[in-house]
Every structure is written in structure tokens, then in C-alpha cells.
Amino acid sequence: MKENQKIIGMHYLKGWIRQMSESNVLTSIVEGVLEDLEKRRIPISKLNEQLKSAPDLRGAYKSLSKPGMRLIAEIKRSSPSKGALAEIDDAKSLASKYQEGGADVISVLTEERRFKGSISDLIDVRNSIELPVLRKDFIVTEYQVLESRVLGADLILLIVAALTDSQLKDFYQLSTELGMDVLVEVHDLDEAEKALNIGSKIIGVNSRNLKTLEVSEKTFELILPQLPESVLKVAESGISTGEQVAKVQDLGAKAVLIGESLVKSGNPVHTINQLLNR
């Protein structure tokens, strides 16, 4: 593991931005993530020391592999596309309701600027429930992978569009070595091929283009049927009805990640039952 993470992070940022042909939302988000990371960074030696006392893992893959459609329920205050979604003063209370409703994994946004999430949300939620927890963020450095394990993330998100091929491979390998499951997110067939090439067990198909924020359900139709049965397929973004859940299930999805319709619901337990037709 590398000591000079700050230099690595900034080198990554400059190199990654040079790859982009035009300004987009994802570039802006990654810039902010790296800036915020510098404010909380501790020496990598101390982070490695904290790994020794990291919480026991809960097995997100196992939880999502149960028969029937599974749910990753997300705690999300805001988004770049919709702005403010819900006032969530107590993330752990909402997580408890998700657990009561039958969610299988709780997704916690930790990105601060666009999604109004926080690391403290992740810690609070994991300490208040028994379900596995997904750290939903823009992971673009090795430091964040290590940090995620220290914080207690059972599942970590790696977005193919935000990483070089070597970073995707290295971060995936490190995550699995640390015992975490990995949700590898793709937006097109080329990204899906990259996810398969590194041996991804869980692949999330996001119908939202992170560069333009546009949503197209055709993304599900294009990618989900092309993924092998051995992969645990997750449908992400733009899903708010039971009919949509049933449709992506027919396309091969074994789980859905839903946030907006749940955080805006006055009764998330009831909403979960409606979405999953229970």
C-alpha cells in the first residue's frame, strides 16, 4: 500500500480529467470528493492500524442471494438531478424502518456536496441495525477503500465510469482482500465487459448516465439480459413502482437499489411492500 496517498489522489484527478472529452457532472463530483477527502485524511499508517479493529462483516452478497427479488434501500437526502429530496435528521431511524420493511441491504450516501451524506451517517446506521451496509460514494482512491472497511462497510461501490481500468482492478482486488463485497456499477455494455473481466460477482446497472444525469430504462433492457446468470444483477435508478421492479426482474435483475421513492414516502414499510409486491 502506498504512503503518499495525497500525491496519488491529485495525480489521479489530473489524469482522469484529461481523459474526459467534455465537462460533465461526474467530473465535478469527483473533484469535490477528492477535496473533501483531503480535509479528513489521516496518515495511511494510522488507517492501517485501525483496520485491526474494524467491525465484523455481515455478508452483503449472501443477503442479496436469497430467493426472490431483493432490495437495497437507500438513505439519500439530495441528488444532483433532483436537488433536495427529504429532510432526514435521523438516518438510523430511517434505516430501522427499512429493516422492519424487509430490506436486505441498507445503502448510505457518504458523499457530502451533492448528496448531503456523511461518514457519521454510515457509522450511525451500521451501529443501529443488523443488516449489511453499502457505502455509496465515489470511490476513486485506495485510501477510500481502506477507510470504508474501517468504517464498517460490508459492501462498497465501484463505478466503472469513474475509474481507469487499472484502478478498477486494483480497488476491486483490495476490497475483496479486506473481506468486503463489491457492487460494480455500469452504464453501458463496454463498462459491463470491464466489470466481468475483473470477476465481478455483483454488477449494478444504473439507468442514469452520470455524465448527463439522464435516465433511460432502455439501459436495463440493453445490459441486464447480456450479463451471465452467475452474476448477481442489481437494477439502479429510476425505479419507483412495483411494475418497474417486476420488469427489471423479468430482465434478469435479482435486486433493486431504490432511494428516492423510499425517502419521500411517509410510510417506507408500506412502500417497500408495494414495490416488492409482498
State each model region's role.
Residues 102, 128-131, 150-156, 176-180, ...:
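Glycine-enriched alpha-helix->loop->beta-strand junction motifs that scaffold or abut catalytic
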Residues 122-125, 171, 223, 275:
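Aromatic/hydrophobic pocket-lining residues that form π-stacking "cages" and hydrophobic walls in ligand
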Residues 202-251, 256-258:
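Catalytic-face loop-and-helix region of soluble metabolic enzyme cores
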Residues 145-162, 168, 174:
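A short alpha/beta connector and helix-capping loop motif
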